[in-house]
């Protein structure tokens, strides 16, 4: 508003009222004051009047003077605010207050001009008078001019607000502003806050726009700041405004107004005048927010979208070349849009009413020029109902009724705001029906007072224990959301379909120092994939892989986050989460999903375990893996007999003493730790495509380091290091009679005296296991009786007579070939174990050789097989004794042949 050069002139004397002038009536209309002609006419004909008429004329002049003084007190004009009255969404043309007139009827107060309204009608006799002339020096004394109005905005230093109830304005419920004595509140670290119902409250550094009934009022655009107010920035007063259905535009933005997808040719706002170019050099950014309009800041070119359709003629031109250097000064150009492009510097926020987004309600963030407010301990906070609230170091997405609002992703904090953490200002926010994330903790979701099984909270890391001592709590409440840490790249999904243009890029490299400053970056999202540092994962829906949902792993440049002690954790609903050193496979409803095998950790991450960084995860319907513990699975409160896990080994007890618990709970899924090779079986049949590769050679030393490799699976066989194990179901025999692969020598100490697998360490129903006793058959009972034969074969013993190997038991009944083959297969497996056994007591080997069923040729083959096994393990004494037994067999065969020839 331009001030008149006559605003400060003295009142016009009564004798000069005969001059033509314009005055303001109470309804704001201009009227020519022709009554003064009547006064002049009366003066010319005063000789014709009586003395009584002269008294009447003097009285009339006095009344005219009094009326003029009354009118003088009715009009109020301020320096910096221009306001327009709206009635039922339509501007009332005769209620616009013009600027100060050039005549002396206006009284000027310092900062406010207002008009009182009742029931949408102006009350002519209820205009609040401005400050009297004797109070002009109050501004020099530091006392501002304020007022409180009904149904109008109230302006203090940095806040203007209006209270609403049940969607209807309450005319008497306008909150008054701070008293004059509170000017120094900024110096006394008292923030400027307010509470409102159904409306946004804006503090120091925020510009916001209000919408009613989801319809913008297109004709209510407020003028931008005038050039003569540029020096206000130098005095530390930021240009702000809070408006009821209006757009607010600041310094350096050209924009174009759109209505119903069509450009309005006469609504284009001109750009800032040339005199304002230097404002950018002074550190004042160019921001704007408007209804259904495009807003473009420094470095961005964008296109407006309506109903997912591009508007071809609404493309805004890019920034002029003179502004290109802003990128070099560290000011990023980011963009978040709700079917429209709305760009701010650091954070964009969107308001939602009745579960519907209002596309033009984006709030701009703190201006770079106002960074010193943080030094004065003034936080930038706001409290809103049913709206999103964003603070400094948080990126979050708003949810309503469990459905994601796809375009409401907020960008992260820019580097300029990093020092806020050093000033002791924590990042907090409070939201209604939205997720709130704080420092390092995520917690489970509760619905209807019932806990959801997939919402196990991870423990606070040891590095964060001191937060409790600093009286900073780490808590959050969530509704159907996940928590993501530093170095995450994620993809947004809607209704099981990927949104190709909604991938959020990783944190920029210049933000890497935020981790060193102890500032976490977290976000909360619903129904999205969450990936941590060293993980590659794949999403499944209804046992079907979604081929296009593979998330790439963390970039190599983010590896140093681990060195800074920042763990990689995530909690997800209906998605797979994989931690550091784990290879796992997903099972659902007892059926394997063949395409869901996760790749193992690359070799570069092996040393993470040595640095004491634990890998934990919590998942729903997926496998969860911890370091060193396996535990028993319980189904319907009953233990599954084949799934009993051994307790933690002794060397893991020190973890409990250190306060780090390793626990895991699983439901019908596979859990595998470090060095596991496993094979999947379904319905007793081997699934040939589901064999996992063995542990690489570099992992063999894990056993020597005291780290056990175990796994527990449901309905499947589990194999550790170099042992191949096969599960039997329904008494079915595998195709081979015995396992062809043998255990490597490194695993002898692990197996110890453990029994072989159930399918291989026992005979059929008619036999008992072989032992050091000889099995003799009882003809009368068709059973094997246990007899004792004392064989003592050692290195120092004399040569052993092995005639028993070539002799048959008298009265032995005939055994079927199938049964004989089964016995011989079991004997062969037992011979392999006995040859490997440590020591030089070979008595049981010869007992087993005596039990071989078949001809002398078969027995000779078994002796030769045993010699080969002994040669593998370089058992010279056993080889010598077996060669003697082989000679006995040969001589016995020769003797039988000679006897047979004699009988002829």
From Swiss-Prot:
GO terms for biological process: snRNA 3'-end processing. The modification Phosphoserine is found at residues 45, 64, 238. Residues 24-72 are annotated as: Disordered. It is found in: Nucleus. Expressed mainly in bladder, lung, head and neck carcinomas. Not expressed in normal tissues except for testis. One of its GO terms (cellular component) is nucleoplasm. Keywords: Isopeptide bond, Nucleus, Phosphoprotein, Ubl conjugation. Residues 44-64 have a biased composition (Basic residues). Coiled coil: none annotated. There is a cross-link at residue 778 (Glycyl lysine isopeptide (Lys-Gly) (interchain with G-Cter in SUMO2)). Transmembrane segments: none annotated. Its main location: nucleus. Pfam families: INT_SG_DDX_CT_C. This is Sarcoma antigen 1. The lineage of its organism: Eukaryota, Metazoa, Chordata, Craniata, Vertebrata. The gene is SAGE1.
């Amino acid at each position: 508003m331009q001030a008149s050069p006559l605003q400060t002139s003295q009142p016009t004397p009564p004798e000069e009222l005969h001059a033509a002038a314009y005055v303001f009536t109470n309804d704001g209309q201009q009227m020519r004051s022709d009554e003064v002609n009547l006064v002049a006419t009366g003066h010319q004909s005063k000789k014709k009047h009586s003395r009584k008429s002269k008294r009447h004329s003097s009285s009339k002049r006095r009344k005219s003077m009094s009326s003029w003084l009354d009118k003088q007190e009715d009009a109020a004009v301020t320096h910096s605010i221009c306001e327009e009255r709206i009635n039922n969404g339509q501007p009332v043309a005769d209620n616009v207050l013009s600027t100060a007139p050039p005549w002396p009827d206006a009284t000027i107060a310092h900062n406010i001009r207002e008009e009182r309204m009742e029931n949408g009608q102006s009350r002519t006799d209820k205009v609040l008078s401005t400050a009297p002339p004797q109070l002009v020096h109050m501004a020099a004394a530091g006392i501002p001019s304020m007022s409180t109005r009904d149904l109008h905005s109230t302006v203090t230093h940095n806040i203007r607000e209006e209270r609403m109830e049940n969607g209807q304005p309450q005319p008497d419920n306008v909150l008054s502003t701070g008293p004059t004595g509170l000017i120094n509140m900024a110096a006394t670290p008292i923030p400027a806050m307010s509470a409102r119902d159904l409306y946004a409250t804006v503090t120091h550094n925020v510009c916001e726009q209000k919408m009613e009934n989801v319809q913008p009022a297109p004709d209510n655009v407020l003028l931008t700041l005038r050039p003569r107010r540029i020096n206000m920035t130098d005095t530390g007063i930021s240009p702000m405004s809070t408006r009821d259905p209006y757009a607010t535009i600041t310094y350096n933005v050209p924009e174009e107004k759109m209505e119903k997808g069509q450009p309005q040719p006469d609504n284009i706002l001109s750009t800032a005048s040339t005199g304002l170019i230097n404002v950018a050099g002074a550190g004042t950014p160019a921001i704007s927010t408007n209804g259904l309009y495009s807003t473009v800041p420094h470095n961005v070119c964008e296109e407006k979208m309506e109903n997912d359709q591009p508007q071809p003629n609404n493309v805004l031109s890019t920034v002029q070349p003179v502004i290109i250097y802003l990128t070099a000064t560290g000011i990023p150009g980011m963009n978040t849009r709700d079917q429209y492009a709305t760009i701010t510097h650091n954070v964009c926020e969107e308001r939602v009413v009745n579960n519907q987004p209002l596309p033009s309600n984006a709030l701009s963030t703190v201006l770079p020029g106002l960074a010193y407010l943080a030094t004065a301990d003034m936080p930038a906070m706001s409290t809103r109902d049913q709206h999103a609230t964003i603070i400094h170091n948080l990126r979050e997405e708003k949810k309503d009724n469990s459905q994601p609002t796809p375009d409401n992703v907020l960008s992260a904090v820019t580097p300029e705001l990093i020092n806020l953490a050093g000033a002791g200002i924590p990042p907090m926010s409070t939201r209604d029906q939205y997720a709130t994330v704080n420092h390092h903790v995520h917690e489970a979701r509760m619905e209807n007072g019932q806990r959801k099984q997939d919402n196990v909270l991870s423990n606070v890391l040891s590095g964060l224990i001191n937060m409790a001592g600093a009286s900073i709590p780490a808590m959050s409440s969530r509704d159907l959301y996940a928590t993501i840490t530093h170095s995450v790249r994620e993809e947004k999904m809607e209704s099981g379909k990927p949104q190709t243009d909604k991938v959020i890029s990783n944190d920029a490299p210049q933000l890497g120092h935020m981790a060193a400053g102890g500032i976490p970056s977290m976000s909360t999202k619903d129904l999205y994939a969450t990936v941590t540092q060293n993980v590659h994962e794949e999403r499944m829906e209804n046992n079907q892989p979604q081929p296009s949902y593979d998330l790439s792993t963390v970039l190599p440049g983010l590896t140093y986050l681990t060195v800074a002690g920042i763990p990689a954790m995530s909690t997800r609903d209906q998605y797979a989460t994989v931690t550091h050193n784990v290879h796992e496979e997903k099972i659902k409803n007892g059926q394997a999903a063949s395409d869901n095998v996760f790749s193992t950790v690359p070799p570069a991450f092996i040393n993470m375990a040595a640095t004491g960084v634990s890998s934990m995860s919590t998942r729903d319907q997926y496998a969860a893996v911890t370091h060193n513990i396996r535990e028993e699975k319980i189904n319907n409160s009953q233990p599954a007999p084949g799934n009993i896990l051994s307790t933690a080994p002794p060397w893991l007890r020190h973890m409990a003493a250190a306060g780090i618990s390793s626990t895991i709970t699983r439901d019908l899924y596979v859990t595998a730790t470090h060095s596991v090779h496993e094979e999947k079986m379904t319905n007793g049949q081997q699934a040939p495509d589901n064999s996992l590769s063995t542990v690489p050679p570099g992992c063999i030393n894990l056993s020597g380091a005291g780290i056990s490799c175990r796994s527990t699976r449901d309905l499947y066989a589990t194999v550790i290091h170099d042992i191949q194990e096969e599960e039997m179901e329904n008494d079915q025999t595998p195709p081979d009679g015995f396992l062809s692969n043998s255990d490597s020598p490194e695993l002898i100490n692990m197996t110890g005296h453990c029994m072989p697998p159930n399918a291989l360490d026992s005979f059929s129903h008619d036999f008992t296991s072989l032992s050091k006793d000889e099995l003799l058959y009882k003809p009368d009972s068709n059973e094997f009786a246990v007899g004792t034969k004392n064989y003592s074969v050692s290195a120092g013993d004399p040569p052993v007579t092995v005639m028993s190997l070539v002799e048959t038991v008298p009265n032995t009944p005939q055994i079927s070939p199938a049964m004989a083959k089964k016995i011989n297969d079991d004997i062969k497996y037992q011979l392999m174990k006995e040859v490997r056994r440590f020591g030089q007591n070979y008595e049981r080997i010869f007992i087993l050789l005596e039990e071989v069923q078949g001809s002398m040729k078969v027995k000779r083959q078994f002796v030769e097989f045993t010699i080969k096994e002994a040669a593998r393990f370089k058992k010279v004494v056993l080889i010598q004794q077996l060669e003697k037994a082989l000679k006995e067999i040969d001589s016995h065969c020769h003797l039988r042949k000679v006897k047979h020839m004699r009988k002829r």
